[in-house]
């Protein structure tokens, strides 16, 4: 039986993905690590499992700020029905916009519309029309692009084709260079052209120097323009893009911002804008309904009163991850299940890394491996609670009918041994072992449970092949996680951090190390782009997009420190933009404003 191996920061874990025809317990997944950053230390330090719990050193976490917020929000199924009627009334108009023709200018216009569908978060409604247009468009791309000298148009078309896996040549950007081989200065005031060029450059591979030049050229001028005389909504878009490019942002998070931007544009398509509003509201009602279910479920578990406050209370944030993984309405059940499993991973991970002693955690993992409720009686009281919670979550998922694939725990202590013995591995060794410790493989595989049987089977077989794309995403996650948590890790005596290892191995300063890691991250992103272009025809987009979305979770979480452990700030803004904002607008407002 082939296996995928996962390691956590304190207790590495190995997981076996059983073939789909093996009937066993539902998906017993490994303990892997989100970020591991302390907040306020309490009690006194001990490593003896026989000492009473009141003497434990652990980092106290406050309760979630969200509490019962989503339980109190109104929800009416009839609102969703009304929104569906309104959207259906507009769909035919948009489909007409996407009708194929051989006219060159109309082809360009349709590709630009496809970009808007993606940017506004509603491309999933028109997948067949998009695929048909891109297939025919790519076959005639030379004719279509001949003589096109608008920087924004060329950049957007490049972005669309590359995003959908078509290897459009980056040589088309040479038309914007002068005789000196540099991008012409006449483009420095073209705000939309620079924005589009900056986004196009994000999709470059390691062999495309021209896109590196494009990124440097566009970013330097955009930084100047952002603080200049641009209209406020354009300045904000520039700032958002420079902070988190669209290519690295979650599609629906970008859409929540872009809808606000697009409606302030002097020239915009009213049908597309109206549909975007209706669609976002429709999705939001789905998410709110899911959060109601999850909040009630979390309250029923009552772990906040049963366990010491050593674990992160992140149910809402776990649902945000599930939305990033798949935001479309048909994945509602999958989001609920994935959120529960991510909450479980967080609780068990924090138990292992932040509170439990080595012998205690070994007992817990043995109980999970054997999957015998009676064995839990030998555990300390707090671990009985954790073990029961583990059993309950998986049985909850099993009752929901998702019990075809089995995943089993198996402990491996590589990182724990390094940390305990103060062994300093090479950076390459650490990344090979710790590369998936930020739940990359785990989250991809868990989320596949929400797809159909064929997609799940294909996805699991692909993961078992240890694809380079996923490995690169996991390595990027390891680097960004450890950069964000270096000071906190060292402050609490946890030396198993790639920044620490790199500094010791190469004799660099912290600043030099971070600078080098940012280069490595960019190289990994190029490698992911390259792998996507290579394999997208052999692996269904439904699966590949989930892996890429997990990569976007990394950027959303670690772009400004550690958003999962300390969600206040930018991470909270993401939660609010999807689940809180726009809620004041009643459904009837959308219904009445859809007349064009």
Swiss-Prot record:
Binding note for cofactor: Binds 3 Mg(2+) or Mn(2+) ions per subunit.
Pfam families named among the record's database cross-references: Terpene_synth, Terpene_synth_C
Listed InterPro entries: Isoprenoid_synthase_dom_sf (IPR008949), Terpene_cyclase_plant_C1 (IPR044814), Terpene_synth_N (IPR001906), Terpene_synth_N_sf (IPR036965), Terpene_synthase-like (IPR050148), Terpene_synthase_metal-bd (IPR005630), Terpenoid_cyclase/PrenylTrfase (IPR008930)
Enzyme Commission number(s) of this protein: 4.2.3.-
Positions that bind Mg(2+) 3: 481, 489
Protein name (database record): Putative terpenoid synthase 5
Biological process terms in GO annotation: diterpenoid biosynthetic process; sesquiterpene biosynthetic process
Keyword flag Glycoprotein: no
Residues that coordinate or bind Mg(2+) 1: 349, 353
Keywords from the UniProt entry: Cytoplasm, Lyase, Magnesium, Manganese, Metal-binding
UniProt-listed PANTHER family: OS04G0344100 PROTEIN-RELATED, TERPENOID SYNTHASE 9
Organism: Arabidopsis thaliana
Cofactors that this protein relies on: Mg(2+); Mn(2+)
Gene: TPS05
Keyword rRNA-binding belongs to the record: no
Gene3D superfamilies given in the database record: Farnesyl Diphosphate Synthase, Terpene synthase, N-terminal domain
Major localisation: cytoplasm
Pathway: Secondary metabolite biosynthesis; terpenoid biosynthesis
Record-stated family: Belongs to the terpene synthase family. Tpsa subfamily.
Motif (DDXXD motif): 349-353
